[in-house]
Amino acid sequence: MMNDGPNAIAVDQLVIDRLGTRVLPGISLSIPTAMITGLLGPSGSGKTTLLRAIMGVQIITSGSVTVLGLPAGHRDLRSTVGYVTQAPAVYLDLSVRENLRYFAAIAGAPVGRVDEVIEVVDLGELRDRRVDQLSGGQRSRVSLATALLGRPQLLVLDEPTVGLDPVLRRDLWALFHNLAAEGATLLVSSHVMQEAQHCDTLLLLREGVLLFAGTPTQLQARTHSDDLDEAFLSIVEQQEG
């Protein structure tokens, strides 16, 4: 299913060089609103660099990135965009609740929002536990909760399901779909092609090159394959051929 409304993100001829290496060679793409877009590709394909550019924290060589109608990194986006990095960005020596109260104060979110997001990410029984006593998956959910404090219009998530067991992964995708149903836009990166089945639209990236943009159904139709790993390999072979 594609969204005919305005795009949440527009990337135009984006070029990024890092340490003398061209990571993104002039990529252009758009991401629709109120949907889940999967940014998929192997490690080292440029996914995190692209996400950093969208967040406005990556130096770009040329091109442009527009987010919710504003230049990436614009100060007015701070309250409308949530970013969850692959490494949990929370304080290990504070409890779940203490972390969220701290970040709520920074975001200007009401105190009552803290307990709301704790329940949303299913950490109610662990709210008073120190983060250094949590599992990796639980720490990731604390990071997600901090990003949800301001009720963001756009949520950017870098490999959020890495290291999670199947049950937690299922529950997290259910949460993502609920957020999209409420009008949020989600951009989710992963190196696991099977995650594509949970997304409304897909962006397949390899070595900084956008190989495919469309729905999972369109990907399967183009490659004549129901297996997502095989579909990705087919797209790569088509590109190289």
Q: What is the predicted role of each segment?
A:
Residues 55:
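Helix-to-loop junction immediately C-terminal to a conserved catalytic motif
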Residues 62-73, 77-79:
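Conserved ABC transporter NBD signature motif
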Residues 101, 105, 111-127:
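Conserved ABC ATPase "signature" region
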Residues 130-134:
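Conserved ABC ATPase signature
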Residues 155-159:
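Catalytic Walker B motif of ABC-type/P-loop ATPase nucleotide-binding domains
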